[in-house]
């Protein structure tokens, strides 16, 4: 009897091992390799791969078909956080939401997190399928710098609400407007946006923080790219790490009576913690400037605040 029981346990153990091996192989088969979708030779006119081998996404460098084939099988949700307070809420929010509803991750589940300082009537938008929105009222004191308030509020809501609801999270400024499809090519663990203006300049001229005592300090001769703070993303945990590091940097600088911008702190963060994917200037082009030949396809335009 004892022998039979041992044999039964052995058979059960082998069955579990085979089952585990089957699902392990299946998951490996479903894993998307960079070479499956990224075609850097498609754009010889621009930088398509960083020195740490992260892809720089331009139109013409990715296979939308392969990406769609992979992500359509995945059960994921993406969050898009936008901060619309004060005078920026009325003239920009409706344009932002309408364009994002139309062009951002069309056909995939998206939760729009709208962060406002007062609860006003939201614009009437006919939401596409798989879309929903949530409004968070910003309670942080407004005497702080606007970026500090934004990132402090974002970090708080990632911890309290967002991290349990989405797999990817992006933070954008309300002055942006989507002009063409922004799809699953932007998804990644830690996604940075190249600055449209500074991408075409020499690194020596980048406006990094040069005061050694600042937490945002990057020495002369160092640095990779200049990143734009208007569009950042990744997993909720990575976005939370970025926000917390920025806030810690601000506190450090205040103690030394220094004041460095959010974008400079962001560039220091990406200098130390290399992004796993970079978005080309096509994903945030300044609408006041005519795009150069390299920017063939403007996906997102940054509107000028001077117009309002």
From Swiss-Prot:
Residues spanning the membrane: 7-23
Active site: 263
Residues listed as glycosylation sites in the UniProt record: 75
Cofactor info, note text: Binds 1 Mn(2+) ion per subunit.
Alphabetized UniProt keyword annotations: Glycoprotein, Glycosyltransferase, Membrane, Signal-anchor, Transferase, Transmembrane, Transmembrane helix
One example GO MF annotation: glycosyltransferase activity
Positions in coiled-coil regions: none
Keyword Cell membrane tagged: no
Topology feature Cytoplasmic, residues: 1-6
Cofactor: Mn(2+)
Superkingdom of source: Eukaryota
Residues given in the record as substrate binding sites: 83-88, 173-175, 195-198
Subcellular location: Membrane
Membrane topology of this protein: Single-pass type II membrane protein
Residues on Lumenal side: 24-308
Gene3D superfamilies, per the entry: Spore Coat Polysaccharide Biosynthesis Protein SpsA, Chain A
Entry GO CC: Golgi apparatus; membrane; vesicle
One of the Pfam families matching this protein, by short name: Glyco_transf_6
Biological-process GO terms, alphabetical: carbohydrate metabolic process; lipid glycosylation
PANTHER family assigned to the protein according to its UniProt record, in alphabetical order: GLYCOSYLTRANSFERASE 6 DOMAIN-CONTAINING PROTEIN 1-RELATED (PTHR10462:SF27), GLYCOSYLTRANSFERASE-RELATED (PTHR10462)
Protein family per UniProt: Belongs to the glycosyltransferase 6 family.
Name of the molecule in the record: Glycosyltransferase 6 domain-containing protein 1
Originating species: Bos taurus
Gene designation: GLT6D1
């Amino acid at each position: 009897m004892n022998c039979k029981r041992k044999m039964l346990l052995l058979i059960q153990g082998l069955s579990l091992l085979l089952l585990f091996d089957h699902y392990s192989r299946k998951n490996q088969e479903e894993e998307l390799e960079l070479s499956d979708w990224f075609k850097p030779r498609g754009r010889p006119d621009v930088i398509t791969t960083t020195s740490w081998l992260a892809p720089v996404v331009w139109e013409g460098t990715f296979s939308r078909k392969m990406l769609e084939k992979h992500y359509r099988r995945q059960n994921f949700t993406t969050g898009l956080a936008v901060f619309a307070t004060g005078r920026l809420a009325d003239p920009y929010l409706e344009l932002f939401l309408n364009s994002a509803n139309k062009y951002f991750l069309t056909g995939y589940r998206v939760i729009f997190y709208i962060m406002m300082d007062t609860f006003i009537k939201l614009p009437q938008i006919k939401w596409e399928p798989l879309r929903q929105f949530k409004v968070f009222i910003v309670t942080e004191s407004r005497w702080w710098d606007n970026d500090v308030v934004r990132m402090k509020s974002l970090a708080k809501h990632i911890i309290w609400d967002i991290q349990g609801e989405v797999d990817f999270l992006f933070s954008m400024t309300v002055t942006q407007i989507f002009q063409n499809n922004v799809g699953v090519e932007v998804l990644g663990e830690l996604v940075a946006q190249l600055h449209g203006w500074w991408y075409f300049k020499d690194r020596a001229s980048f406006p990094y923080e040069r005061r050694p005592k600042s937490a945002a300090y990057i020495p002369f001769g160092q640095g990779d790219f200049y990143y734009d703070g208007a569009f950042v993303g990744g997993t909720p945990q990575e976005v939370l790490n970025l926000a917390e590091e920025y806030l810690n940097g601000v506190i450090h600088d205040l103690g030394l009576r220094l004041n460095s911008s959010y974008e400079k702190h962001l560039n220091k963060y990406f200098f130390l913690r290399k992004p796993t994917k970079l978005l080309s200037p096509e994903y945030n082009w300044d609408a006041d400037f005519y795009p150069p030949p390299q920017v063939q396809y403007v996906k997102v335009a940054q509107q000028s605040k001077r117009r309002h």
